[in-house]
Regions:
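Short glycine-enriched, charge-decorated loop/helix-capping segments at active-site entrances
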Residues: 45-49
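Contiguous beta-strand/loop segments that form the cofactor/metal-binding neighborhood of enzyme cores
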Residues: 53, 59-139, 156, 163-178, ...
Length: 237
């Protein structure tokens, strides 16, 4: 399975910093990924709403940082443009080890803005220091503020990190032992399960519908003709 965020240089840099004790005890994991990406009805419907199709990766990375299982959660979502399913969701809660989390994900971020942008970050807060990351899909910036070290690292974003996945898989074959850096099928199943659980929890609360289907039609039409945009589905001849 390719839980690709686990293979990214920025998340591994932050996790190594945490392991060094630079931020004290891990206390809070905050993850946000909002883009004007895949719109409802464009495809991927078999993968479910945005928070499952895309959001499960952020569910996984929060659990990966915490090193523990989800214990409690409360989710709020919005049915943007009066679409049948929520396309934005925020969930907060706790892990069994006491670490607190919040995850925000949605492809609703300025879909019809003249110049599109996004908001994607991870914010890791400890009892003594912090570590955080932002990216623009081209370059990632990691800022580390520990008790003895302060760093600001800028490197290429890295995309889906397929090269790292292949390298780890090849090493596992050559040694006959699965690399500990490779996720198990169980990890993917848990990420999927809890993405669905958070969606189900949101449906149990007030689920407002804001906007109109006509706006969604305009979004789809714009994305159909865009040459450069977020998460465009390429048509092959």
């Amino acid at each position: 399975v390719n839980l690709y965020l686990r293979n990214s240089w920025y998340h591994n840099t932050i996790k190594d910093f945490i392991a060094q004790g630079e931020i004290g005890e891990l206390a809070i994991v905050r993850v946000c990924h909002m883009t004007p990406g895949l719109a409802p009805g464009e495809g991927h419907e078999y993968e479910g709403p945005s928070f499952h199709d895309c959001g499960m990766h952020y569910v996984d990375i929060a659990r990966w940082y915490a090193g523990s299982e989800f214990k409690t959660w409360n989710a709020q979502a919005v049915r943007m443009w009066n679409y049948k399913d929520p396309w934005w969701l925020q969930c907060h809660g706790t892990f069994e080890n006491g670490v607190v989390f919040d995850i925000t994900q949605g492809h609703v971020y300025g879909q019809l803005a003249e110049t599109q942008t996004h908001n994607s970050y991870v914010d890791i807060i400890g009892t003594k220091g912090i570590a955080r990351m932002t990216h623009d899909f081209k370059t990632a910036i990691v800022e580390l503020h520990g008790v003895t070290q302060t760093h600001r690292l800028i490197q290429p974003y890295g995309g889906k990190n397929i090269d790292t996945l292949c390298k780890l898989f090849a090493e596992s074959i050559e040694t006959g032992r699965r690399s500990e850096a490779l996720p198990e099928f169980r990890d993917a199943a848990i990420a999927s399960e809890y993405a669905w659980r958070f969606l189900q929890d949101a449906r149990g609360h007030d689920l407002p519908a804001i906007g109109e289907l006509e706006t969604l039609r305009q979004i789809r039409e714009r994305r159909r003709t865009m040459k450069n945009g977020y998460g465009l589905l390429r048509k092959h001849a």
